[in-house]
Amino acid sequence: MRTSKYLLSTLKETPNDAQVVSHQLMLRAGMIRPLASGLYNWLPTGLRVLKKVENIVREEMNKSGAIEVEMPVVQPAELWQESQRWEQYGPELLRFVDRGNRDFVLGPTHEEVITDLVHREVSSYKQLPLNLYQIQTKFRDEVRPRFGVMRGREFLMKDAYSFHTSKECLQNTYDVMYRTYNNIFTRLGLDFRAVQADTGSIGGSASHEFQVLAKSGEDDIVFSSNSDYAANIELAEAVAIGQRQAPSATMELVDTPNAKTINDLVEQFNLSVEKTVKTLIVKGANEGQPLIALIVRGDHELNEVKAQKLPEVADPLEFANEDEIKTKIGASIGSLGPVNLPIPAIIDRSVALMSDFSTGANIDGKHYFNVNWDRDVALPKVADLRNVVEGDPSPDGKGTLQIKRGIEVGHIFQLGTKYSEAMKATVQGEDGRPQTMIMGCYGIGVSRVVAATIEQCHDEKGIIWSSDEIAPFTVAIIPMNMYKSKNVQIFAEELYQSLLNKNVDVIFDDRKERPGVMFADMELIGVPHMIVIGEKNLEKGEIEYKNRRTGEKQIIAKEQVLDFLAQRVNA
């Protein structure tokens, strides 16, 4: 590709409304341009990268035995009503009515459509297992689109769905998809982690997220220093070690009129925050127990996903308001605790090991100091309630936990029969009777992968693509003052044609621009290999090679340039 025939569209200045690095660089590199909130045009440079990522995903999915299909973006409401997600999904599901007054949606995902399709096409257990995928545009009406294509309303996604007659068969395909995703993100050259995750609104049993490590990530991911253990912070198990110490002081009721928070209490009474507990009141799952107390250590945070999974707690999790708490307990938030508490309590594992701790007295303006389990208050139910913190022991007993920010780029689920049961998707089983199909689903945000890669791989000059395979161009030819030197022009043209003949993805900067502008643009868009052709070097039979990723510079004989590049491109 010649730059004189190409829409390069780079920008010198960073747009003011771009908050994260990937959004800034995708705009500056001429990869995308905004159309409306959360909607973007993909310009040639961006589309080249997007298509290359898409091709890697497609190649690895095909290797896994999955079969590509394509389904409509527009979906009839009846399917969503049949699966019962019409009411559940919320306002991010864009609904509309056609001229025949029929309800439709713009698909944010395709569980309903694929279940309906397979139900119609597959009739016998002999046709299973089956894993179908598509790479297609999705739409979710995000309440606050931000960060460019990282969280846009329209995005490109690879979504796959597998169908089985047994859990063992599902597990086999799930394991294949797990390995396939690892292959995809390894091939993309990304630093990533596969982490245990919550199934969320999709539903099902087992689930893993694939997270690209990046400081700008929206998720906290947890992994062990000495093992393969990794989990989303929502699911990471918090281990409590040690034993409860014997009481060393008598419980004391203390006036604390100005201590409304744990920080107030710690500062005013010179307490260790590790010796305090906080009591949070949530709605109960049973009418007989409308409120439940959840108690964690003062320096820990309640994990709402873990709390919501407790059978005693209402789903979705809902905190009680001040009036409800005051009416039932007789004290305000900030003065609550387990002693003489008139509602059931569940305490975190770490709280169960505490002794001589301080807590609200369920009397406004008062706290108990030196509280001990069994002696002063019966030990309630114990559960894992908190978020892990850096340095916690790993649940597998190997090493300690580290926490980093991550960008979710892939998610795999074992759905079970959530959709097939609701939509009566059955096949004839081996015994001749109808059998509900068991499902898995596997998603990759293809356009999000592009942004996540840039978040992880960039410098002050621009993008550094993590793999030659996804760079918009793998080689750039930069001729210095080409229009003033016949020798430079001739060699640059010959090299360009030679690289094209070898199917190298090359960009030839044949603009009448200063060399500094050419270098800046090629570094900005992240071309990994640059060949610099100058009159003085050519007179010595040499050209200069620059590596965008390592910063390496090397003078090589011009006759060796093709062999030299062959050893480095995609290496």
Swiss-Prot record:
GO molecular function, one term: ATP binding
Localization per record: Cytoplasm
Keyword set includes Ligase: yes
E.C. number: 6.1.1.15
Gene Ontology BP terms: prolyl-tRNA aminoacylation
Main subcellular localisation: cytoplasm
KW Ribosomal protein (keyword) present: no
Catalytic reaction list: tRNA(Pro) + L-proline + ATP = L-prolyl-tRNA(Pro) + AMP + diphosphate
InterPro entries per the UniProt record, alphabetical: aa-tRNA-synt_IIb, aa-tRNA-synth_II, aa-tRNA-synth_II/BPL/LPL, Anticodon-bd, Anticodon-bd_dom_sf, Pro-tRNA-ligase_IIa, Pro-tRNA-synth_IIa_bac-type, Pro-tRNA-Synthase_IIa_type1
One annotated Gene Ontology cellular component of this protein: cytosol
Keywords: Aminoacyl-tRNA synthetase, ATP-binding, Cytoplasm, Ligase, Nucleotide-binding, Protein biosynthesis
Name of the top EC class for this enzyme: ligase
PROSITE patterns on file: AA_TRNA_LIGASE_II
Subunit record text: Homodimer.
Similarity remark: Belongs to the class-II aminoacyl-tRNA synthetase family. ProS type 1 subfamily.
Function field: Catalyzes the attachment of proline to tRNA(Pro) in a two-step reaction: proline is first activated by ATP to form Pro-AMP and then transferred to the acceptor end of tRNA(Pro). As ProRS can inadvertently accommodate and process non-cognate amino acids such as alanine and cysteine, to avoid such errors it has two additional distinct editing activities against alanine. One activity is designated as 'pretransfer' editing and involves the tRNA(Pro)-independent hydrolysis of activated Ala-AMP.
The record's note on its domains: Consists of three domains: the N-terminal catalytic domain, the editing domain and the C-terminal anticodon-binding domain.
Protein name per its UniProtKB record: Proline--tRNA ligase
Organism: Histophilus somni (strain 129Pt)
Gene: proS
